[in-house]
Every structure is written in C-alpha cells, then in structure tokens.
Amino acid sequence: MAGHSKWANIQHKKARQDAKRGKIFTRLIKEITVAARMGGGDPGANPRLRLALEKAAENNMPKDNVQRAIDKGTGNLEGVEYIELRYEGYGIGGAALMVDCLTDNKTRTVADVRHAFTKNGGNLGTDGCVAFNFVHQGYLVFEPGVDEDALMEAALEAGAEDVVTNDDGSIEVITAPNDWAGVKSALEAAGYKSVDGDVTMRAQNETELSGDDAVKMQKLIDALEDLDDVQDVYTSAVLNLD
C-alpha cells in the first residue's frame, strides 16, 4: 500500500516540537495524571498510561516527576482534577481541526480556543462537524532504505494492522491505538527503530495547502498548540512549506 510523502512533514514537526520542549513536560504530567486516574497506575494494564510513559522516557522526564504524576492520578498524592475536552473546527481552505484539551476551567479553555481560531483565520465548529473524517490509530515511521519485506513481516507478526510505503521511501507501520506500544517494543527488539510515531487522530481525507495558505495554517496550529490547556492538535491539512 502506497502513501503520501511524510519525510519533510516529520522533520518540520520535530523542529517545532524541539522549539516547544519547555511545554512538553507540563503536558506529559497532565496526561500521565489523567491516564492513571482513568485506568490505574499499572502501565501493563493501562495502555493510555503506557503510551504516556513512553513519551516521558523519550523526552527524558525525570522519574520522580513521572511517579508524582502517577501518584496524583491514583489519589496517593493530592492533585488538580482535570477534565477532558475536544473541540472541532475549520482552518485555512476548510481544513479540519480537532483540538484535545485537559483543563480545570472549561470556560477559560473554550474562550482561549475560540480566540485562537478567530484571530488566525479559522472558525470553531460544533461537536461532530469534522470528527467523521478522523480515525484513531497508532503509527510508526521508519527511514527510507529499511528492508520493506522484512519490516512488514516483523510488524504484522507483532500485531500491526498495516504497513505503508510512502512516496519518499519511508515506511509507516499502522497499529490499533492500544497495540502501539507493544508493536513499537517488539520492532525495537527485532532491530527496527522508528524515527517518528504516536497514537493520533488521522484524517482520512487530507487537504493540501501550499504558499501563503500553508503558512497561515501553520500559524493557526501554532496558536492552538501554544495554549496552556491544549494537549494535541490534529488536522487534515498537509502543509507544503518549502
């Protein structure tokens, strides 16, 4: 199965993540706390917590910080009670956006999200207005040059749902959300280390944007991601920023 070119977008995403690394710990602490509250403190029995801990390890979060977040979630330590919110809307060229938040103040959050949309050429929609276009799945991306047949065999044996070769030669392994961490670990044990990966809401129909439209869309995404209550921003936009 063939896919679009992902390589440039991955590199661009990594550059933006590095620039925002100061906020990553705060978001991870929130996610670990909520994951532990919802599913318990054992990552072996809690896929959401296991994913959050994988991200914490990748970002070199101190173990004491991680344990405190788990303890706050399980009630062993006092902590803030966060609620989960999802907002949907439209960006440049009608591109779909989904914005996941963890907050202790819903009124503040919706006002901030609406302002970011409005100020940057988008508009906040109603619940369900774009959700139909997204599917919840995990993915792992491997550099061009990896033995596709061997990787496919290892991935499918590990429980992956699909393996996609992108136009630029990179290879993408698709998983069910709860299987992502297990597939990643199995492939690493077999000698395959991914260069990107996550559990995401992926658009089934994409919107290609280039030139000024791509720049404006990136500005909208950045404005949303910069909000303290925002955890993740998903979009149908494919940005050609070169």
Curated annotation (Swiss-Prot):
SUPFAM superfamilies: YebC-like. Its main location: cytoplasm. The keyword Phosphoprotein does not apply. GO terms for molecular function: DNA binding. GO terms for cellular component: cytosol. Keywords: Cytoplasm, DNA-binding, Transcription, Transcription regulation. One of its GO terms (biological process) is regulation of DNA-templated transcription. It is found in: Cytoplasm. The keyword Nucleotide-binding does not apply. Pfam families: TACO1_YebC_N, Transcrip_reg. Belongs to the TACO1 family. This is Probable transcriptional regulatory protein NMC1563. It comes from Neisseria meningitidis serogroup C / serotype 2a (strain ATCC 700532 / DSM 15464 / FAM18). The lineage of its organism: Bacteria, Pseudomonadati, Pseudomonadota, Betaproteobacteria, Neisseriales.
